[in-house]
Amino acid sequence: MNYRDLTLRERQVLGIIIQSYVVSAMPVGSRTIARNYNLGLSDATIRNVMADLEADGFISQPHTSAGRVPTDKGYRYYVDLIMNVSRIDEEEKRMIDDRFSNRNSELKGTSAEVLGTAARVLGSISRQLAVVLPPRLSNAVFERLDIVQLASSRIMVVIAIQSLFVKTIVMELNAEISRQKIDAVVDVLNERLPGLTLEEIRSTIAQRLSDFKGSEELMNSIVSSADTLFDESSILEQLYVSGTENIVDQPEFKQPEKVRDIITMIEDKFGMARLVDNAVPSALRQVSECEVAISIGTENRTGKAADLTIVSSPYFAGKMIGRVGVMGPKRMNYEHAVRVVNYMAGCLSEALSGNN
């Protein structure tokens, strides 16, 4: 977004309006700024500065108030050019560390629990709605496959992906099959597929297994179902969300229709995943070694999120990349959100690397 260069006074007043509005949820007037902040400016001078900010679209006046509130443009300027992000609070750091570092042996090998824990802790500490997207698995490496026989013609295929995720699918066969034939198929699959990405398996499995002789019916069922068995998109159904009460308790969302919109949005896991994923292009701030994306109001790609800000950061599990973030009102404490999201992303990367 392009802006004109704000003067020092304009930056100071805009920053104060945003910081005050974040705390009080009330429009901010020139008299409040003159009385509570030592800027060395008169009420009249502050009024003039606010008039210039309003004329340029950084703040606006609600219908029933003499004060002003930030616009999306004002928040964006603040995030890009005024906000100063410090290190995470030691107490909050300790709370996160206690749930990850001290429990790493307990969580080892159970990535679903790691991601669920991250969402719960982040929601509690940020006091926003926390969202954790599992890593994209299109470039994930297949590790092994097992088949559990549920009945004479019914099996459950269990696929382990890079020691991090397990996918299960129940299949009905056209005829009964023995355990011996199942084991023969499993042995061949675990000999020829490990080290391939799911995408590579989907596109080449038929030719890789074309010379197999033995349990052809089961192997043919595996090959014909490869697009489903080795499809990564269903992993998004495991989106982890926590802290719904944090967002619906905000003054901005007290009206019943707003609450309904929020709940509907949260229940749409694919829509939520797209929202967080698509937050990346709008603005990136370098914090430590992670890029934190901040998408504000109308920058979000759905009308239901026009009153929300999304702060997110990537985390890493081997070569796979997921995202962790928070959603809340545009009137959020941006510095705090960036700090805790960034730190949580680092903890997730460390925990999942430990599982790998």
From Swiss-Prot:
Protein's UniProt keywords contain Amino-acid biosynthesis: no
Biological processes annotated in GO: negative regulation of DNA-templated transcription
SUPFAM superfamilies on file: GAF domain-like, Winged helix' DNA-binding domain
Domain of life: Bacteria
Gene3D superfamilies, A to Z: 3.30.450.40, Heat-inducible transcription repressor hrca homolog, domain 3 (3.30.390.60), Winged helix-like DNA-binding domain superfamily/Winged helix DNA-binding domain (1.10.10.10)
UniProt KW keywords: Repressor, Stress response, Transcription, Transcription regulation
GO function terms (MF aspect): DNA binding
Function per UniProt: Negative regulator of class I heat shock genes (grpE-dnaK-dnaJ and groELS operons). Prevents heat-shock induction of these operons.
Name used for this protein in its record: Heat-inducible transcription repressor HrcA
Species classification: Bacteria, Pseudomonadati, Chlorobiota, Chlorobiia, Chlorobiales
Gene: hrcA
